[in-house]
Design a protein with these regions (language model features):
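Acidic, metal/ion-coordinating pockets
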Residues: 1-263
């Protein structure tokens, strides 16, 4: 199949702190060139010191070549982001959050003269943030846009792989790809489901290999041993980028290939 017939989307796992940001800033351009990327999506909810995102960080990510920023339960950790979420079309918060909260949960953009949608949804199993039922919510959005958009990517920010896999099969044949985020641990279950939807339980993270999900191992261990919640810190060395490249048919939105990447 010719390049003109496909869309290649690079979707990157949760960016952790300054180390993760620097890794993106220095490597995104070369990654896009290597894989001939048409659309770059990153989860940015941990980019500000490990918790939240600021307008300045978001703008710098866009300048670096990111097209869409997704988030999750930490999106409001930085108060400065609230107003920005209403102004910037291409930064998302989970669509199934309360309607009273700032921001929006999906966007539509043009890629190769075709409309492409990115939807951000949060799970509810094992999550403390109260959300609307993700299955009911995503179905409403997909039904609303499906007649005008064939290529749809979903960031499902959730704790439970049971819920994530169920979500993938729920959307099988309705969307191009379902990628899990939140745990910061990359899974090796990437595949194309039988009705043409690309799936992976978790993208992993853009964070340090010498860490506990991007954070200081000593502090994490101390908290577990002493049964207390401690203020943690990100680890900035040996940072890797984890994610996937999904190749899909330009006209039908059907996924053709999903490939894990780690750089």
């Amino acid at each position: 199949m010719q390049d003109n017939d496909v869309i290649r989307a690079l979707i990157i796992g949760d960016i952790i702190g300054d180390g993760g940001l620097k890794k993106i800033f220095f490597n995104l351009k070369s990654l896009k060139e290597k894989y001939n990327i048409d659309l770059a999506i990153v989860n940015g909810e941990n980019s500000s010191g490990g918790f939240g995102i600021t307008p300045e960080i978001a703008e710098n990510l866009f300048k670096a070549g990111v097209n869409v920023i997704t988030t999750g339960n930490h999106v409001y950790a930085e108060s400065s982001i609230r107003e920005y979420l209403d102004k910037q079309e291409y930064i998302l918060r989970p669509n199934n959050f309360s309607d009273l909260l700032e921001g929006h949960g999906y966007c539509i953009l043009n890629v190769k003269n075709e409309k492409v949608a990115v939807i951000n949804i949060q799970g509810f199993l094992g999550m403390t943030f109260i959300v609307k039922n993700p299955f009911e919510n995503i179905k409403k959005v997909v039904n609303m846009i499906r007649n005008k958009v064939k290529t749809i990517f979903v960031d499902f920010h959730a704790e439970s792989n049971y819920e994530k896999e169920s979500f993938g099969y729920f959307l099988n044949g309705l969307v191009t790809g379902v990628v899990g985020t939140h745990t910061h641990i990359m899974t090796q279950d990437e595949r194309i489901l039988d009705k043409g939807t690309a799936y992976i339980s978790d993208l992993g993270m853009t964070g340090s290999l010498n860490s506990v999900i991007g954070f200081n191992p000593e502090i994490s261990l101390k908290g577990l041993l002493e049964y207390v919640a401690l203020r943690t810190e990100t680890v900035e060395d040996d940072v890797i980028i984890q994610g996937v490249v999904i190749t899909s048919h330009l006209k039908t939105g059907r996924a053709l290939k999903i490939e894990r990447i780690q750089k």
